[in-house]
Amino acid sequence: DDSRLLLWGNANFADIGMDKELYDGHVVDAALTDTAYIVLLDDGSVAYSGDKATSLLATDIPAGAKSGVVSIAATANSVAALKNDGTVLTWGVTTRGEGAIPQFSAKPIKIEGGRYHYTAVLEDGNASSWGHNRYKQINVPAELTNDSVDVKNIFTGYYQNYAIDANGKMHTWGLKGFLLGTDDLGRDIFARLVNGGKMTMTI
């Protein structure tokens, strides 16, 4: 309720320093990449809240992200801001298609980020995904793009998406799982073992 952001965990390889005097009491939301994060402030602006001033997330913040932002999201190496007019801005490392924003059927009202992709719920109840598609995580089911289903909310995992419709039904697309499951970073255990990786498993 006091608009503060609290962080904990191992910060050895992450930039999670924060200028408390600048942002405390004004944080509405936060979006985390693999090693850093941005915050949405109560004035509708986006700020890079780490302490590495040379980070692309800090130096490449678009001018349009300084006001009117209503939703933020992040992938492993990029971040996105959704403005109140439906404009989506992305910056950071977008080499996997994260910056290839599609033509929407209506104004986006919420955005979520996976490992290398983004998904948005639109004002007309449809959904849209873009970015990396190795596991078909941007192949939105037809019923979520042709006005057949009224999507009310979305959530993303590393390589999958979950949409909740007006009737409370969940729709999913993307990675359906690996033969031997995943490790704690979402990687294919079977592929790791085949390629000489080692790990302990309980069967």
For the regions a protein language model found, what residue spans apply to each?
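Transmembrane alpha-helix signature in integral membrane proteins
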Residues: I189-I203
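Short coil/turn segments that connect the beta-strands within blades of beta-propeller domains
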Residues: S3, D34-T35, G44, A76-N77, ...
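Repeated scaffold domains used in trafficking and secretory/extracellular systems
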Residues: G25-D34, G68-A76, K107-R115, D150-N153, ...
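Conserved core positions of repeat-based scaffolds
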Residues: L7, A36-V39, Y48, S78-A81, ...
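Acidic/polar residues in short coil/turn loops that connect beta-strands
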Residues: D1-D2, D42-D43, N84-D85, D124, ...
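Short glycine/serine- and acidic-residue-enriched loop/turn motifs that recur at repeat junctions
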Residues: L6-D24, A47-A65, L89-S105, G131-D147, ...
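N-terminal, non-cleaved signal-anchor transmembrane helix
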Residues: A166-L179, I189
